[in-house]
């Protein structure tokens, strides 16, 4: 076929995946016919990072772009599959990054909330946005975060992610300001709001200038594109101090340090001061604005829990501390148990859990799972049945397993432990109905049925296909399936079985329309020909490739029969150099040293 490249271009593999609808995958593919952006907000892709942490890309109609949102699933998510849980939205700081929310990147929200019965929602990105709807686009972004977080995202979480309409929001610094604004500007939306070191007076003397400077420093954003010129109506509309009355009835928690060096700071040469000069100044601003905000609430007789620490700068360890300190109040407002899991170990699962201390503490008692039982732990789940034994499922493999439905899916219960593979690169785990394979580059992918059988015949990951890079998916045009691998996808139908197509032959197959073309599904593996050529057979014909001729299809019928009489590529005509095309009264196909014309069922061979 091609130059025997070690790896087929990833664009081909992704092109295949984009034409299909995922059947069994933690990553939801988008059909080719649905590539146009939806009119309304919708989830475009889901990736399970573990059995308790999910990343989804939600198309925001307001921002006309997909927004990554991560979720930390409630403690009882797996043990009580019919239950719904309150939502706790956690907002990032000014320098929010596009890869991960700071609450999991720089603090331990994932560990802390593992045994809490709340769905934690972590929007990713939004640097310098203050999570608000901007007046105009700026710096390549059309920020409409308030619309996204208050109108577009909640219905999706309630419909598809077992989340109730009982909501709370908390954030640090910029996110603390935004938390108060979202709650105040959207009465009734939030039951609980917390600000850790937030700027809670945005219009007082010097604050607009400070925010303007901060936005310019963090990403080069113009605050005038956000709220207009200082003193304008949008600044007042986004000032928690001025929104105080609208926060009546919301459970509130605010905190800040003093700016003096604390337990998480490195002392400077000046007594009591940290080397983190910027963090010192920012925390002093946060403290002053928080105190002013609390004074306003007291005048209005609106209750608030204020925690003023005698030390501490504007940095993550203190916000991690406040996250833990405020949980009891958050849990009460959200109507969930503030305590951790109440569970113990017993039976066959106990022995494994005690030996595998990496699992962490238990999060549930045993509960039914298919024909066996399961128990949840902080870093994975353990399954047991008399027929399959006792096995832990964790990490990215555990995430994929949970994403496809776990024990209730066609995979069934695990039949072995996760093991490393001989190449030192990948890992796999076997289940009743298939296996899951993982590498850092390809992620964790399910292998089952005809694809697993054919892949096994070819040597699994050691064979020519390499590792799977996507889940099995339905072919969009005909009854069949496709699964992408590092070196070309396999196509399957009930009549043809599973066969791989790769390289330039795959390019040609794609150009013709894959299985929806006259060629249909592949019926055999690619085979070598003379002059470094390759070919693949399909239901309706073949695709031939050589370095000099390129890749072309020859369809079954009179033209193929005549070329066969001439000896195929070994005959005087050589390899094809075109697909068949219509001519007056028939069809024609060109070859390296001639052409064949078929008219009225009669073939004519012409040399060059």
Indicate residue ranges for each PLM-predicted region.
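Terminal low-complexity, poorly structured segments
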Residues: 19-20, 348
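A generic structural-conservation signal
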Residues: 10, 122, 166-167, 192, ...
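Non-catalytic cap/lid and distal C-terminal segments of serine-dependent acyl enzymes
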Residues: 2, 11-17, 24-340
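Extended, compositionally biased repeat/scaffold regions that form elongated interaction surfaces
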Residues: 339-608
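Short, Lys/Arg-rich cytosolic juxtamembrane segment immediately N-terminal
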Residues: 6-8
